[in-house]
Amino acid sequence: MTKDIHQHRILILDFGSQYTQLIARRVREIGVYCELWAWDVTEEQIREFNPSGIILSGGPESVTEAGSPRAPEYVFNAGVPVFGICYGMQTMAEQLGGKVQSSTEREFGYAQVEVLGQTNALLRSIEDAIAPNGNALLDVWMSHGDKVTAIPADFTTIAQTATCPHAAMACESKHFYGVQFHPEVTHTRQGARMLEHFVKDICGCECLWTPATIIDDAVARIREQVGDDEVILGLSGGVDSSVVAMLVHRAIGDRLTCVFVDNGLLRLNEGEQVMEMFGDHFGLNIIKVEAEERFLSALAGEDEPEAKRKIIGRVFVEVFDDEAKKLKNARWLAQGTIYPDVIESAASKTGKAHVIKSHHNVGGMPAEMKMGLVEPLRELFKDEVRRVGLELGLPYDMLYRHPFPGPGLGVRVLGEVKKEYCDILRRADAVFIEELRKADLYNQVSQAFAVFLPVRSVGVMGDGRKYDWVIALRAVETIDFMTAHWAHLPYDFLGHVSNRIINEINGISRVVYDVSGKPPATIEWE
């Protein structure tokens, strides 16, 4: 009998910090399951979840202001360890009888905290340096304006800085801990060890959450959910749908039918690569639909980016629906929904007024399809999906290649999309990526691609002049894709790529390089 991989679990209450998802990812990396819920969760919901421990996240608000978020009182009466981070520490202190004040000295960025003694379970045996008095020093990342000025009864101060007298506090008898810094960010060098101390040593969680156990659990769940029915999946060749295909195939074999739609907006040879990998190599049952003409006809004359996206989404649903109707026994639709999609959608347990979007991985299936949903990646972050993919035997290069937009080249051909433009762009993009790999630059940038500009520019070829199209190259470096810097690729490299594109691809007279950051520009041009 295999162990329940959700048996030991951490509940993270979200107070609005930009780092909250990072806390969850760090806990998962330790090997323990966790979920992210809104701060105003009910006692009944906490009891039902039955956490081994609770983490209170940071947040942008001030504990000193009326109406600011508070942890449910039950959190401190549930009989499980509690770890407050930044705002989480402040609300813990205030709710348990301590004092929090707004400070004129805002701490933001790197700081060094002094650990006061080594007897507490959270910070024991952790150090980055030693102070002259023999106390451990930790390099941490601060981001706060308020600070705790008096800790609750039964608590002790376990760390301090020159400007923050209570940088960390602990009540060992109840296993309550608070830190004013952010252990989840890499700038806090020993942060992972602090979280590991809390999750494993203090909460007593076993490390049951691994790629191998996630696969076993997903396969068992799929088999239980679909029984003897058949399943259909829209396979794009992207990371999420590829991992779903492998999981569902492992669970039910040939009762999975994958539909791969070649919409004419894919990268060079992508359709052939998908069919070869999943059909020939892994033996999945795949239907390839040649739909280039249908998509390009629908896009003809349209040059507005959002309208193009909607057309591409609508036509995909129509094509997929046509194929699904042919599969009379398909009762289930598999989708590559992942945990961040769930967090962002109204269906999420963190669903509040600030919901960002309603997510449907395939653009929303028609209601008349009346299929049940199979979403085996629903609990996983993107980095976990990739690790599961590696465990399933998918190639590293495929799992870790740069992001590609859902509408494909439809939003990298500016303005109206035509077959001629797509063919030119496909080849230019392939040259750029090939040269990045050859120069060992591909993994040094977060995303790189070519863009087709629908403007003609004069050029010289031999003794004659030519009047052809312009290609823009884009490469960025980013951690979270929310902000990005343009990549400072070597001039010699860019010159070589430009020469290859102009000399090898008919119809291009000029290559330019995009040196815009995000903000103000977005990463994609449309």
UniProtKB/Swiss-Prot annotation:
The protein's role, per its UniProt record: Catalyzes the synthesis of GMP from XMP.
Protein name per Swiss-Prot or TrEMBL: GMP synthase [glutamine-hydrolyzing]
Molecular functions per Gene Ontology: ATP binding; GMP synthase activity
Residue ranges crossing the lipid bilayer per the database entry: none
Active site residues according to the UniProt entry: 86, 182, 184
Annotated GMPS ATP-PPase domain residues: 209-401
Positions that bind ATP: 236-242
Catalytic reaction equation(s): XMP + L-glutamine + ATP + H2O = GMP + L-glutamate + AMP + diphosphate + 2 H(+)
SUPFAM superfamilies: Adenine nucleotide alpha hydrolases-like (SSF52402), Class I glutamine amidotransferase-like (SSF52317), GMP synthetase C-terminal dimerisation domain (SSF54810)
Taxonomic source organism: Aeromonas salmonicida (strain A449)
Residue intervals of the Glutamine amidotransferase type-1 domain: 9-208
InterPro entries given in the database record: Class_I_gatase-like, GATASE, GMP_synth_C, GMP_synth_GATase, GMP_synthase, GMPS_ATP_PPase_dom, NAD/GMP_synthase, Rossmann-like_a/b/a_fold
Pfam families for this protein: GATase, GMP_synt_C, NAD_synthase
Pathway: Purine metabolism; GMP biosynthesis; GMP from XMP (L-Gln route): step 1/1
Top enzyme category: ligase
Subunit structure: Homodimer.
Enzyme Commission no: 6.3.5.2
Keywords: ATP-binding, Glutamine amidotransferase, GMP biosynthesis, Ligase, Nucleotide-binding, Purine biosynthesis
Source lineage: Bacteria, Pseudomonadati, Pseudomonadota, Gammaproteobacteria, Aeromonadales
GO CC field: cytosol
